[in-house]
Amino acid sequence: MKQLMMIGFGAMASEVYAHLPQDLELKWIVVPERSVESVKQKVDRHIQVISDINQCDGAPDYVIEVAGQAAVKEHAKNVLAHGWNIGLISVGTLADSEFFTELQQTAEQNGAHLHLLAGAIAGIDGIAAAKEGGLEKVTYKGCKSPNSWRGSYAEQLIDLDQVHTVTMFYRGTAREAAQKFPANANVAATIALAGVGMDNTIVELTVDPDTTQNKHTIVAEGRFGQMTIEMVGVPLASNPKTSTLAALSVIRACRNSVEAIQI
């Protein structure tokens, strides 16, 4: 049976843990030192809960990150240096161009692969394919409820308690969006890296006081033609800032790591 390492154990990780493929064994969970004991109480005894990659006593077949940008900065390079493949959900971390280059070089030098998971959006395969044939323009539009934007940079741009209609409060590049909205803009970073890049992808962020769902729209143009992809998703009940589909994309990546036929 193949073995999995999971970095993080918050709301999304708990969802993934509950729905892992039967033929993939979760062997290691990596969390901050302060959280080790509490996480141990939530998982099976055979799972090793550690705070440092170097404490791992084996070699995972696959590593997934579901912990946020700080955890990517702390652990991803070390994972790749061990020659282990890793799937990232916190793709916004790669808005840091120097860090992106470090990870790319480390992966190449150690024969490892860095997988950027689609997360909360559909159509990443189409964007990546269009890039091969002349993708020229990509705009990402994200719309969420006021509660989904609370605790983010949005509160510095708009009074979320005084929003009475659909309101766009941010327009900029994917690089800037990923840096300013680390918990909300991983989708923008994924779209950008699949397509025309961090500095050429336009991001528009909107708040809707009458919704409880997350709406993602991609509009792309190029020599291939035009495409519009719209996704209306439901947040996790345990965390309104996290898309259910994002958690499911991690589960799908785990399944792909063990299946002979991958989609």
From Swiss-Prot:
InterPro entries reported for this sequence: Asp/hSer_DH_NAD-bd, Asp_DH, Asp_DH_prok, L-Asp_DH, NAD(P)-bd_dom_sf
Binding site for NAD(+): 120, 186
Pathway assigned in UniProt: Cofactor biosynthesis; NAD(+) biosynthesis; iminoaspartate from L-aspartate (dehydrogenase route): step 1/1
Key words, A-Z: NAD, NADP, Oxidoreductase, Pyridine nucleotide biosynthesis
Record's catalysed reaction(s): L-aspartate + NADP(+) + H2O = oxaloacetate + NH4(+) + NADPH + H(+); L-aspartate + NAD(+) + H2O = oxaloacetate + NH4(+) + NADH + H(+)
Entry's EC annotation: 1.4.1.21
Gene3D superfamilies named among the record's database cross-references: Dihydrodipicolinate Reductase, domain 2, NAD(P)-binding Rossmann-like Domain
Active-site residue list: 216
GO molecular function annotation: aspartate dehydrogenase activity; NAD binding; NADP binding; oxidoreductase activity, acting on the CH-NH2 group of donors, NAD or NADP as acceptor
Swiss-Prot/TrEMBL GO biological process terms: NAD biosynthetic process
Ranges in a coiled coil: none
SUPFAM superfamilies (alphabetical): Glyceraldehyde-3-phosphate dehydrogenase-like, C-terminal domain, NAD(P)-binding Rossmann-fold domains
Pfam families with a match to the protein in the record: Asp_DH_C, NAD_binding_3
Further comment: The iminoaspartate product is unstable in aqueous solution and can decompose to oxaloacetate and ammonia.
Database matches in PANTHER family: ASPARTATE DEHYDROGENASE DOMAIN-CONTAINING PROTEIN, L-ASPARTATE DEHYDROGENASE-RELATED
Functional description taken from the UniProt entry: Specifically catalyzes the NAD or NADP-dependent dehydrogenation of L-aspartate to iminoaspartate.
Protein family per UniProt: Belongs to the L-aspartate dehydrogenase family.
Protein name (database record): L-aspartate dehydrogenase
Organism: Acinetobacter baylyi (strain ATCC 33305 / BD413 / ADP1)
